[in-house]
């Protein structure tokens, strides 16, 4: 029973973690450039085309679009879906390992790991020279 509970909880938390990872991508992309997190809505940085709902699904959209913008065919860095997927796993894994037995501890562990990883990523990005590419 606990195994099924753990797996179902992890299956719920995996896409939630990927969505949080996608949001953290936006934060790390926009904040250093002084852009708002709310406006304009998600868009291609090259052609400025607003992304549709089906282009906003973490990891799956990247695969469906073959890693390119639908508007201008600009390549989307491979690091984006990797970080989104790892964010999903980071939130889901503590629950899969025993979340139903210790739900609060599993959620706190997953959230702390996720935040820690993204804080480290933000520090790494802040130390990267402004002109270098980010994938």
Give residue spans per PLM region:
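A membrane-topology feature that recognizes alpha-helical transmembrane segments
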Residues: 1-135
């Amino acid at each position: 029973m606990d195994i099924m509970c753990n797996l179902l909880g992890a299956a719920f938390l995996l896409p939630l973690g990927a969505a949080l990872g996608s949001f953290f991508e936006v934060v790390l992309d926009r904040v250093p450039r002084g852009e708002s997190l709310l406006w304009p809505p998600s868009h291609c940085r090259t052609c400025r085309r607003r992304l549709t709902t089906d282009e906003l699904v973490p990891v799956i959209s990247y695969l469906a679009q073959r890693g390119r913008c639908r508007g201008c065919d600009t390549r989307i860095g491979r690091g984006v879906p990797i970080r989104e997927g790892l964010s999903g796993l980071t939130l889901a894994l503590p629950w899969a390992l025993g979340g139903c037995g210790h739900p609060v501890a599993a959620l706190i562990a997953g959230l702390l790991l996720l935040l820690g990883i993204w804080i480290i990523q933000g520090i790494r990005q802040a130390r990267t020279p402004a002109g270098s590419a980010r994938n």
